[in-house]
């Protein structure tokens, strides 16, 4: 496969970047496959275009029209999903992984399309009943909801290049607001493929969507009070963006989805070998290995009664040992690589941090087999289970997320202890 150049979509046309930019790689074999750059794009002009062209066109549509528009788009993309699967494989995703991303994303469009039934056939929504604020009803209050007159900027993560885009644009399009989509560059080639089909469909009004495949550094310099910014990614990056002076000055809403230290708790009354115990083990492993653990819903903390700690350890080890790692196109492979070498190095760094206070009891950083691929060329990473026998003292596992097939097993003695451990994840 020759190296292809990703395009950006700005102000109603496809634009080639002024420079070659960043090289993107096949996650399975490490081959260079695309380059991405935003060099030459005028972010301020793109945002004005969205406000002046996309916003009026969407705002004049009723909720019914917007909902039917989303339904038509969902059906259009669903008819073309086979090609999306082909490109998704380059990210290291298995077919099951791609199903979550591609069809899950399209499902979001269908879901928001169906919400039109809860709204009137109008471009605005009157909320609740009028509130009487004076004795003679000469002063009343009533809320009316209308679309913002700005643009939504969606800064997305690398793990769900399709879902991440579609779940967000479904919201802003239904609300009558245009968007600029900024996918994570590492897997932006899959987002670009789907985005091209969206534009080719001619279903959306002009100016509804724009795409930046390369860097979007500086785009927040142009936000205004009617705009909104959404971010999915690391907490560190999110905090920096949230503190941008322009966001603060213009009071721009900033929605952040970042690190998640999700917990799964085995009840005190569950017996090893029971159906509930088996479901627990299966679910932990499934969440560890789906998308190679690159999910915000992945289980990072496994909290179990102290008296069954060893049984859980053994059961997790056995099930993970049967998980074949490799090229997802090869028969029998159940877990592919991480999205790229950069992601692999980041996970290794986080594992090293976690290992300072806890012990690896299942898996290895280096000693594992890969089927149908070279584990050194691809971004492969074996499932890792840590044991933290003192989770109230060694608290790194409640703060550090290794965004891969990594989890920490820890004991508890009472329900109150289990609740306290869950809370230490700070809402995850």
Question: Which positions does each model-derived feature cover?
Answer:
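N-terminal Rossmann-like NAD(P)+-binding subdomain of aldehyde/semialdehyde dehydrogenases
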Residues: 1-137, 322, 339, 347-348
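Rossmann-like NAD(P) dinucleotide-binding subdomain of oxidoreductase/dehydrogenase enzymes
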Residues: 120-279, 412
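Conserved C-terminal structural/oligomerization subdomain of aldehyde/semialdehyde dehydrogenase
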Residues: 28-34, 68, 203-206, 225, ...
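Hydrophobic packing residues within well-ordered alpha-helices of enzyme cores
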Residues: 88, 109, 191-194, 222-223, ...
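ALDH superfamily catalytic-core signature
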Residues: 197, 201-202, 228, 237-392, ...
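Residue-level detector of anion-binding/catalytic polar loops
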Residues: 178, 360, 428
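Short, well-ordered beta-strand elements within core beta-sheets of diverse protein domains
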Residues: 32-38, 55-59, 133, 153-154, ...
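Residue-level signal for inorganic ion chemistry
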Residues: 30, 66, 176, 209, ...
């Amino acid at each position: 496969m020759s190296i292809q150049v990703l395009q950006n979509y700005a102000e109603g046309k496809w634009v080639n970047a002024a420079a070659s930019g960043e090289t993107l790689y096949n996650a399975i074999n490490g081959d260079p496959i695309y380059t991405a750059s935003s060099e030459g794009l005028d972010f301020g002009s793109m945002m004005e275009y969205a406000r002046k062209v996309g916003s009026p066109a969407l705002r004049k549509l009723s909720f019914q029209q917007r909902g039917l528009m989303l339904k038509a788009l969902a059906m259009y993309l669903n008819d073309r999903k086979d090609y999306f699967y082909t490109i998704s494989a380059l990210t290291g995703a298995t077919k099951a992984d791609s199903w979550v991303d591609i069809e899950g994303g399209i499902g979001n469009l269908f879901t928001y399309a169906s919400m039109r039934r809860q709204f009137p056939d109008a471009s605005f929504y009157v909320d609740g009943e009028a509130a009487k604020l004076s004795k003679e009803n000469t002063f009343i209050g009533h809320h009316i909801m209308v679309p913002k007159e700005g643009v939504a900027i969606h800064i997305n993560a690398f793990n769900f290049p399709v879902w991440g885009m579609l779940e967000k644009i479904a919201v802003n399009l239904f609300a009558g607001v245009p968007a600029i989509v900024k996918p994570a560059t590492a897997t932006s080639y899959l987002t670009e493929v789907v985005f091209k089909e969206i534009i080719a469909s001619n279903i959306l009004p002009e100016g509804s969507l724009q795409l930046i495949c390369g860097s979007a550094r500086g785009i927040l310099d142009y936000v205004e009070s009617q705009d909104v910014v959404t971010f999915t990614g690391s907490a560190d990056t999110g905090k920096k963006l949230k503190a941008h002076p322009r966001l603060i000055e213009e009071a721009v809403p900033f929605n952040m989805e970042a690190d998640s230290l999700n917990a799964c708790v085995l009840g005190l009354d569950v017996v090893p070998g029971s159906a509930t115990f088996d479901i627990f083990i299966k679910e932990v492993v499934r969440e560890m290995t789906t998308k190679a653990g690159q999910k915000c819903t992945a289980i990072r903390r496994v909290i179990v009664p102290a008296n069954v700690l060893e049984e859980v350890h053994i059961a997790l080890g056995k099930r993970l040992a049967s998980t074949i790692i490799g090229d997802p196109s090869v028969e029998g492979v159940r877990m592919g690589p991480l999205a790229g070498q950069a992601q692999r190095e980041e996970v290794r760094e986080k594992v090293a941090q976690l290992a300072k206070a806890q012990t690896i009891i299942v898996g290895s950083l280096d000693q594992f087999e890969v089927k149908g691929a070279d584990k050194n060329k691809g971004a492969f990473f074996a499932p890792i289970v840590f044991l933290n026998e003192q989770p109230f003292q060694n608290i790194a596992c409640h703060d550090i997320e290794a965004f891969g097939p990594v989890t920490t097993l820890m004991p508890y003695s009472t329900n109150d202890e289990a609740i306290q451990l869950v809370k230490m994840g700070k809402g995850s």
